[in-house]
């Protein structure tokens, strides 16, 4: 099976380019499953119900997230009732939502999606390595195709988890930095890996934010209200092919698609 995995959707520009391009990409690659990180989808920080539904309607099957998941209070009730929106599984058990989705594609291929968060230069959370162990054991034979979104800052930490899970999951992707890396590969054990998917949003910006606002904060050191940039919207991500019988990745390809209106 082929899956498309999409980097952090940032604000309205990100949602617009997603809606514009995803169906075409699914047709081109014959992809039957789509995962997208949605933690910046509502005005650049967080998710609200209307935005979540917009992303699902565009053709996304599962939404992952990270440290901005609770930036909008409206998400609390939504994440409790919408199993297709994940929060990091290594958050405290009492935290609203869940970090594992287990289901199947339209053709019946069982798929699991795990959402994890890094701990280096990030808010406190439980160990993502041990959390992954527990969830893989919980999934067991119910799904051979397992996709992991590791929302983390440090590349070394991302690589470490990729190597740690090599051969036990199908795909490990990094998110969070909004900068697409060029290290896509199939690891020796058969796990597809990339350090960061990049950003689906306005690339005429500083990682999605209006450039002048970020520069002003660096120059003056004063608090500045960030606003999502506009223009040059692009979709970043990967398309990965997985042998659904073995759960091993066959190939991984980077995606960077510009909006026709940019």
Predicted regions and their residues:
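Acidic, metal/ion-coordinating pockets
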Residues: 1-262
């Amino acid at each position: 099976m082929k899956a498309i995995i999409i980097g952090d959707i940032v604000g309205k520009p990100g949602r617009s380019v997603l809606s514009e391009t995803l169906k075409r990409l699914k047709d081109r690659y014959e992809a039957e499953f789509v995962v997208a990180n949605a933690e910046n989808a509502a005005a650049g920080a967080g998710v609200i119900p209307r935005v979540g539904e917009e992303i699902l309607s565009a053709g996304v099957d599962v939404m992952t997230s990270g440290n901005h998941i609770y930036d909008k209070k409206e998400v609390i009730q939504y994440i409790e009732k919408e199993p297709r929106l994940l929060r990091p599984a290594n958050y405290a058990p009492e935290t609203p939502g869940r970090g594992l989705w287990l289901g199947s594609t339209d053709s019946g291929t069982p798929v699991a999606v795990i959402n994890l968060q890094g701990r280096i230069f990030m808010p406190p959370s439980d160990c993502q390595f041990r959390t992954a162990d527990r969830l893989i054991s919980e999934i067991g034979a119910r799904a051979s195709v397992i996709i992991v979104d590791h929302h983390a800052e440090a590349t070394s930490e991302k690589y470490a988890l990729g190597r740690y899970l090599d051969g036990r999951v199908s795909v490990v992707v990094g998110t969070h930095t909004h900068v697409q890396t060029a290290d896509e590969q199939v690891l020796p054990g058969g796990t597809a890996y990339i350090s960061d998917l990049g950003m689906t949003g306005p690339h005429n910006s500083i990682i999605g934010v209006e450039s002048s606002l970020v520069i002003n904060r660096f120059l003056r050191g004063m608090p500045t209200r960030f606003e999502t940039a506009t223009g040059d919207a692009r979709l970043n991500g990967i398309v990965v092919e997985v042998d659904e019988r073995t759960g091993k990745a066959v190939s991984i390809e980077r995606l960077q698609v510009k909006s026709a209106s940019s």
